[in-house]
């Protein structure tokens, strides 16, 4: 007596509700023993394919009990049913249902992939089966390169890769010529003799007669169940089960999903590119905006540093725009000398300025004459190009010595002509040139201005005839906080003046304000750029939904051969993330190209890239792939396998 393997009791299956309810199976009671070869026959609409789908756990009965090897299936989850299909069943379809992008070898190996079999073992087993079925020379052929009979043999090999304890064949010869059909039936007969349980659905009684048991359906009910002379029992085949919990199985599935993602992208190159385009533009915009903001911040901070690091500027009046500031004449050289005596002060320079005509020979230009102390160039960090700077002795002696900048040098002297020792007129005051400094790069005034510097005593006495200063520049020691130094300096000047008739400009405050403003603007523009990235993500979701719709049959095939819900979810999620990652990489490259073009065509804009920004771009593109790819992937994973298989 053979052991019962498949047991159906009171199986009913209906579709629709109410007036539209259609009864397809009506109380099927059936037991199929291990090692039997059963043919299910009947006219179209008799319910034989629906019964086969229930036997293969592709569909669930509306009522009744179905047990596989004693295990009740009605309460099993989708993943548990997938495991049951993978470990017990092998499917042979009338239309083969091979994946067109995969080779014969990879199609056969697909169920073993979901069973967790390692890559080399999976490949070797698939090759052995194909060689056994006469396809050893066509391992790498795609389905489109094979004949119908060869495709059906690939389908048979796929059914056997995990052991094929039960082979379910739905009209296996229906799409074949007579010779190929006879070959397929011969293979199925051989499998039966080897101990496999075969359930064959056909409408051809001549084919059914080759089975040892024939079950006839009519209008959803069994009307006949007759047996022929049984084939001598053979040992049941051993189902080869891999360790599905091993890391190798997960790695194999991830690798295969990655490969399938590349194949899907390559099959639709233009669509993939257009999908990526939104991500490319979004990532390029975000990275470029962040780089521009970072570059602008660095440039502004460099300009502030060019004014002098750790410096305080003291001006008369209550602030910029104070109309009474011109009348305030209390800022004196003595104040500068008092400030120089403070322990936390590094250097001090008085300052006053006026605009006059600079003349040398026939050359006459308008320039700015600055009366400063000997420490001015140290406070402001000017770089000496030629000659020397005036010293304390020159200040004391009211020396008529002048230091000029590069712009003045270019306008007053010929190319290659040395200015040192030459006399120029500052208005009507003759002064001897003793040095040349680099042009102003502070960014708080044009670097095209013409500037010359003379001792402040000379400017006050010989040129302007005044005793008050326009400003005092103070550089504090590096280890001293500017805010604390500002408080001390303000307190000293209030004591000297008896009133708050001055204001202090703290370069550190400017730096902080500009940094904060720049960060805010960068964030604002980056948020605008992120909108384009979100639009790109919506495009990815749209295309992935289209892809799921187009590949519904592929999803059904994967589920039929044992793919779990998580496997399908993983497959489509990897595709979405891969599209976004490649788009992110292209976006970063585009941003770098934009930076090169900016540097080449414009010196006013500097893009400063950072590794953090690039890594953040890849993180954002991956996140977009996960967020916008999850819904299409979940939709694919929740498909009903039989409905997916039946959809063209």
Curated annotation (Swiss-Prot):
Keyword vocabulary terms for this entry: Antibiotic resistance, ATP-binding, Cell inner membrane, Cell membrane, Membrane, Nucleotide-binding, Translocase, Transmembrane, Transmembrane helix, Transport
Domain of life assignment: Bacteria
GO MF, any single term: ATP binding
Family matches, as Pfam families: ABC_tran, FtsX, MacB_PCD
Presence of the UniProt keyword Transmembrane in the record: yes
Stretches that traverse the bilayer: 273-293, 521-541, 578-598, 613-633
Region listing for Disordered, in residue ranges: 222-248
Binding site for ATP: 42-49
Keyword Translocase among record annotations: yes
Cellular component terms (Gene Ontology): plasma membrane
Gene Ontology terms: biological process: response to antibiotic
Principal localisation: membrane
SMART domains: AAA
Membrane topology reported for the UniProt record: Multi-pass membrane protein
Entry EC number(s): 7.6.2.-
Localisation per UniProt entry: Cell inner membrane
Annotated ranges, domain ABC transporter: 6-244
Record note on quaternary structure: Homodimer. Part of the tripartite efflux system MacAB-TolC, which is composed of an inner membrane transporter, MacB, a periplasmic membrane fusion protein, MacA, and an outer membrane component, TolC. The complex forms a large protein conduit and can translocate molecules across both the inner and outer membranes. Interacts with MacA.
Similarity section: Belongs to the ABC transporter superfamily. Macrolide exporter (TC 3.A.1.122) family.
Its job: Part of the tripartite efflux system MacAB-TolC. MacB is a non-canonical ABC transporter that contains transmembrane domains (TMD), which form a pore in the inner membrane, and an ATP-binding domain (NBD), which is responsible for energy generation. Confers resistance against macrolides.
Name of the protein this chain belongs to: Macrolide export ATP-binding/permease protein MacB 1
Organism encoding this protein: Aeromonas hydrophila subsp. hydrophila (strain ATCC 7966 / DSM 30187 / BCRC 13018 / CCUG 14551 / JCM 1027 / KCTC 2358 / NCIMB 9240 / NCTC 8049)
Gene: macB1
């Amino acid at each position: 007596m053979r052991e019962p393997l498949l047991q159906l009791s009171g199986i009913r299956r209906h579709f629709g509700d109410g007036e539209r309810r259609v009864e397809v199976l009506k109380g099927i009671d059936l037991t199929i023993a291990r090692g039997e070869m059963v043919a299910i026959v009947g006219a179209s609409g008799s319910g034989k394919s629906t019964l086969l789908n229930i036997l293969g756990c592709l569909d669930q009965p509306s009522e009744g009990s179905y047990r596989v090897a004693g295990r009740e299936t009605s309460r099993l989850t989708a993943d548990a049913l997938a495991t049951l299909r993978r470990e017990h069943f092998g499917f042979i379809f009338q239309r083969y249902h091979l994946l067109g992008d995969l080779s014969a070898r990879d199609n056969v190996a697909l169920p073993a992939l979901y069973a967790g079999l390692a890559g080399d073992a999976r490949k070797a087993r698939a090759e052995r089966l194909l060689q056994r079925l006469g396809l050893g020379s066509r391992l790498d052929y795609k389905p489109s390169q094979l004949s119908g009979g060869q495709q059906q043999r690939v389908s048979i090999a796929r059914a056997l890769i995990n052991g094929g304890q039960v082979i379910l064949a739905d009209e296996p010869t229906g799409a074949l010529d007579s010779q190929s059909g006879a070959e397929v039936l011969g293979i199925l007969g051989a499998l039966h003799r080897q101990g496999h349980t075969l359930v064959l659905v056909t409408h051809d009684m001549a084919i059914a007669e080759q089975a040892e048991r024939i079950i006839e359906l009519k209008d959803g009910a069994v009307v006949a169940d007759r047996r022929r002379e049984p084939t001598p029992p053979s040992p049941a085949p051993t189902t080869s089960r891999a360790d599905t919990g091993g890391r190798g199985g997960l790695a194999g599935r991830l690798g295969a999903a990655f490969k399938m993602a590349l194949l899907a992208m390559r099959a639709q190159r233009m669509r993939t590119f257009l999908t990526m385009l939104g991500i490319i533009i979004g990532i390029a915009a975000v990275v470029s905006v962040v780089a521009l903001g970072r570059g602008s911040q660095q440039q502004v901070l460099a300009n502030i540093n060019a004014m002098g690091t750790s410096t305080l500027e003291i001006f008369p009046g209550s602030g910029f725009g104070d109309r009474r500031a011109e009348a305030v004449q209390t800022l004196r050289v003595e104040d500068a000398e008092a400030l120089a005596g403070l322990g936390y002060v590094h250097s001090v320079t008085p300052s006053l300025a006026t605009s006059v005509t600079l003349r040398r020979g026939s050359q006459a230009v308008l320039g700015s004459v600055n009366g400063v102390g000997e420490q001015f160039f140290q406070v402001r960090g000017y770089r000496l190009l030629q000659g020397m700077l005036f010293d304390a002795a020159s200040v004391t002696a009211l020396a008529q010595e002048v230091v000029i900048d590069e712009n003045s040098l270019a306008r007053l002297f010929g190319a290659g002509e040395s200015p040192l020792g030459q006399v120029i007129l500052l208005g009507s005051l003759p002064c001897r040139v003793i040095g040349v400094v680099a042009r102003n790069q502070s960014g708080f005034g044009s670097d095209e201005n013409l500037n010359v510097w003379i001792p402040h005593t000379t400017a006050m006495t010989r040129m302007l005839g005044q005793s008050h200063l326009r400003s005092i520049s103070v550089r504090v020691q590096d280890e001293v906080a500017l805010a604390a130094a500002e408080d001390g300096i303000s307190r000293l000047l209030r004591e000297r003046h008896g009133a708050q008739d001055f204001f202090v400009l703290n370069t550190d405050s400017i730096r902080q304000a500009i940094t904060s403003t720049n960060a805010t603007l960068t964030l604002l523009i980056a948020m605008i750029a992120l909108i384009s990235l979100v639009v790109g993500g919506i495009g990815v979701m749209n295309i992935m939904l289209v892809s799921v719709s187009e590949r519904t049959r592929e999803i059904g095939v994967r589920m039929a051969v044992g793919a779990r819900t998580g496997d399908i979810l993983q497959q489509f999620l990897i595709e979405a993330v891969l599209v976004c990652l490649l788009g992110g990489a292209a976006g970063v490259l585009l941003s770098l190209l934009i930076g090169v073009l900016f540097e080449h065509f414009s010196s006013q804009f500097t893009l400063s890239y950072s590794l953090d920004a690039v890594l953040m771009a890849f993180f954002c593109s991956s996140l977009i792939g996960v967020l916008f790819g999850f819904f299409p992937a979940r939709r694919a994973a929740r498909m009903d396998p039989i409905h997916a298989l039946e959809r063209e």
